[in-house]
């Protein structure tokens, strides 16, 4: 089976498990990008612990859910943004978050995968990957 977008597959599996009030979900195939996005979601308090399980093929990720996610998804196409655009909360960003201080936009920056708040603090731009609130 060929999965075109592993990040979109993982986030949709998390969302589906979350709306069905599951306590954990197993996501496969695993990728470095998916693991880095999960680290940001864990830092922001949306998910609990997660662990990588090496099954000899693609790998799996077992994620503990906390029931705090209302909506999660990828941003397609992946827009490049400057840090000023993230700080000002432009109109197009309102399509993904209900308000500036509610939720998180996940950004791939030269400093790694960060939340939009961390990217503004480090004054760096990047490519928008996903949103969660």
Curated annotation (Swiss-Prot):
Biological process annotations from GO: translation
Organism (species): Desulfurococcus amylolyticus (strain DSM 18924 / JCM 16383 / VKM B-2413 / 1221n) (Desulfurococcus kamchatkensis)
Self-association and partners: Part of the 30S ribosomal subunit.
Family designation: Belongs to the universal ribosomal protein uS8 family.
Any single GO CC term annotated in Swiss-Prot or TrEMBL for this entry: ribonucleoprotein complex
Full protein name: Small ribosomal subunit protein uS8
KW Ribonucleoprotein (keyword) present: yes
Gene Ontology molecular function terms on file: rRNA binding; structural constituent of ribosome
Keywords: Ribonucleoprotein, Ribosomal protein, RNA-binding, rRNA-binding
Protein origin, superkingdom: Archaea
Function: One of the primary rRNA binding proteins, it binds directly to 16S rRNA central domain where it helps coordinate assembly of the platform of the 30S subunit.
InterPro entries, per the entry: Ribosomal_uS8, Ribosomal_uS8_sf
Keyword Calcium among UniProt keywords: no
């Amino acid at each position: 089976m060929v999965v075109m977008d592993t990040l979109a597959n993982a986030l949709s599996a998390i969302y589906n498990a979350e709306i069905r009030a599951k306590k954990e979900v197993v996501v496969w195939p695993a990728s470095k990008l998916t693991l880095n996005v999960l680290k940001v979601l864990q830092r922001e308090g949306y998910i609990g612990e997660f662990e990588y399980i090496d099954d000899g093929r693609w790998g799996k990720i077992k994620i503990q859910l906390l029931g705090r996610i209302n909506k999660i998804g990828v941003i397609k196409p992946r827009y490049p943004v400057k840090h000023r655009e993230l700080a000002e909360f432009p109109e197009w960003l309102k399509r993904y978050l209900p308000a500036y201080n509610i939720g998180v936009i996940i950004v791939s920056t030269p400093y790694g995968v960060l939340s939009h708040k961390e990217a503004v603090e480090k004054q760096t731009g990047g490519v928008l990957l996903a949103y969660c609130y």
